[in-house]
Amino acid sequence: MDSRMLSDQRFCRRIFAAALCVLVLLADSGCARNLWKRALHLKMTEKYDDYEYPLHSHSAHYQKNDRCPPPPQTLPDRACEVPSCRSDSECERHKRCCYNGCIYACLESVQPPPVLDWLVQPKPRWLGGNGWLLDGPEEVLQAEACSTTEDGDEPLHCPTGYECHIINPGNTAEGIPNRGQCIKLRGNPDGRNLRHKYYKEYFGSNSNNVVGYVKNQQKHLG
């Protein structure tokens, strides 16, 4: 009896050990499967990143580079066959790494558009009740902003010897003033002050009349 019981115990131990080994193998197989799936996912992600990264990088570069010409509406000939670039340092001094409609290549740079800041305070002028009639200091103006719109405040007049060339008519109904640039008057210097007075008294805040008057004067002087 004792030998039989010992034999049964050994058999049970063997079965338990075998079952434990099977469980361990199944667990290892699940871990291995999960590790394999994770490695495959990372590999595919790396491949996707390798493909997308240059596009994202170039796109961000293009947005920041204001010396690039605008992308063409139609694909130019051999646009995809020219040497590509990834930064301006790979191009000649007068060229920039820009999108040519197919790839990023070294293209001729363009000048950035001029900036007209409406919030920049104009250069100092002589102050007074009729300050706009007084001669101010002679100076060279570089795209100084001006306006002829009156909405309770004194308009942003140009210095003596300059007139306001309206570029944007604005919208008086929405409270948006017109704006322009100061250009030097041509013709008789003795009558240049009276021209500002003529604007003030006869045209007031009507920017259309001012624009028409300026055009007529330019035709007359031309």
UniProtKB/Swiss-Prot annotation:
Protein name, entry field: WAP four-disulfide core domain protein 1
An annotated GO BP: negative regulation of wound healing
Any Gene Ontology CC annotation: extracellular space
Signal sequence residues: 1-32
Keyword Disulfide bond (UniProt): yes
S-S bridge residues: 68-98, 80-102, 85-97, 91-106
UniProt superkingdom: Eukaryota
InterPro entries: Elafin-like_sf (IPR036645), WAP_dom (IPR008197), WFDC1 (IPR042357)
Example of a GO MF term: serine-type endopeptidase inhibitor activity
Role noted for this protein: Has growth inhibitory activity.
Keywords in alphabetical order: Disulfide bond, Protease inhibitor, Secreted, Serine protease inhibitor, Signal
Record organism: Gallus gallus (Chicken)
Compartments (UniProt record): Secreted
Every WAP domain range: 61-110
PROSITE patterns linked: WAP
